[in-house]
């Protein structure tokens, strides 16, 4: 079999020659590594990976093909994909398409047959690097120039780019073996407005499972419009990019939280709640991307394994007096959760909805439900 040549170039001058397993052409972005062993389709379709080239450290990727039920959004958001080995055969009764065909259909430039261990060590030691994947006609100097010309994610507002353009209702529950995605429960007593900063579908499904009528709104929706919907709670979704430029979201969240409506944030939503409460955020060296990150609940001291995907973090040293730290990473000590002490608002940096990953932190969704019950804080 004849393979199209491909090249990954990093801004530090590192070059990796391999083969193309996706669309021809060129892509640039911030190169990060993800340590999850499974869930490559969920990772590719997670809007939080916009403008990022994802390196998967597990050596065999593509074994189970792809299928429509495992998508976390309507398309691939990752800027590119880097893997070690693409198996020649797909083995899964759920598979509808091979990974290379899927990548080609969505125009994703991807490379295989490179030393991902060497690449991961570079990213771990030097930090996330801007990079370029070139597939087809290879020009090393042009690839290096493209990598070095990428401005980086610091200061980049991507939430409004990946957000929905229209308000819509979400009624699909989580997937079950043998029955597919569950319909909404007959009784849905809680009206939740979910801000879409790049929301994953499984987050919305877990809200539906818990009896929420979910209305999804664009990232730039003013607080007044959300409050006019008279929600029982407001959810702040995950998303890509730097939270600090999202002034529209920060001001809206501040106004909503001040009304006393229960508010729950995940990932970018966590960072935005922190900023709206007076804290600051920082760019991490290489971020957290994987499904095996230990996090400790600071109240119960319980350790949970979580799914993580973020390159920015709330700076714990900048938390104001009305915000307490609730969770901390056991990998590097970074802040993983906060709660307002004067309002029913809290957030978590990781992904309690997993997809892919463990469900140890899923009870945070139940905490959100408790806040919306009549005996909760607001009522």
From Swiss-Prot:
Domain Glutamine amidotransferase type-1 residues, every copy: 191-378
EC number: 6.3.5.5
Annotated spans, CPSase: 1-187
Catalytic reaction equation(s): hydrogencarbonate + L-glutamine + 2 ATP + H2O = carbamoyl phosphate + L-glutamate + 2 ADP + phosphate + 2 H(+)
Enzyme class: ligase
Keywords assigned: Amino-acid biosynthesis, Arginine biosynthesis, ATP-binding, Glutamine amidotransferase, Ligase, Nucleotide-binding, Pyrimidine biosynthesis
InterPro entries in alphabetical order: Anth_synth/Amidotransfase, CarbamoylP_synth_ssu, CarbamoylP_synth_ssu_N, CarbP_synth_ssu_N_sf, Class_I_gatase-like, CPSase_GATase1, GATASE
Tree of life domain: Bacteria
An MF annotation (GO) of this entry: carbamoyl-phosphate synthase (glutamine-hydrolyzing) activity
Associated pathway: Amino-acid biosynthesis; L-arginine biosynthesis; carbamoyl phosphate from bicarbonate: step 1/1; Pyrimidine metabolism; UMP biosynthesis via de novo pathway; (S)-dihydroorotate from bicarbonate: step 1/3
Binding site for L-glutamine: 48, 239, 241, 268, 271, 309, 311-312
A single BP term in Gene Ontology: 'de novo' pyrimidine nucleobase biosynthetic process
Active site (record annotation): 267 (nucleophile), 351, 353
Disulfide bonds: none
PANTHER family with a match to the protein in the record: CARBAMOYL-PHOSPHATE SYNTHASE SMALL CHAIN (PTHR43418:SF7), MULTIFUNCTIONAL TRYPTOPHAN BIOSYNTHESIS PROTEIN-RELATED (PTHR43418)
Family: Belongs to the CarA family.
Subunit composition and interactions: Composed of two chains; the small (or glutamine) chain promotes the hydrolysis of glutamine to ammonia, which is used by the large (or ammonia) chain to synthesize carbamoyl phosphate. Tetramer of heterodimers (alpha,beta)4.
Main function: Small subunit of the glutamine-dependent carbamoyl phosphate synthetase (CPSase). CPSase catalyzes the formation of carbamoyl phosphate from the ammonia moiety of glutamine, carbonate, and phosphate donated by ATP, constituting the first step of 2 biosynthetic pathways, one leading to arginine and/or urea and the other to pyrimidine nucleotides. The small subunit (glutamine amidotransferase) binds and cleaves glutamine to supply the large subunit with the substrate ammonia.
Protein name: Carbamoyl phosphate synthase small chain
Origin species: Thioalkalivibrio sulfidiphilus (strain HL-EbGR7)
Taxon lineage: Bacteria, Pseudomonadati, Pseudomonadota, Gammaproteobacteria, Chromatiales
Gene name linked to the record: carA
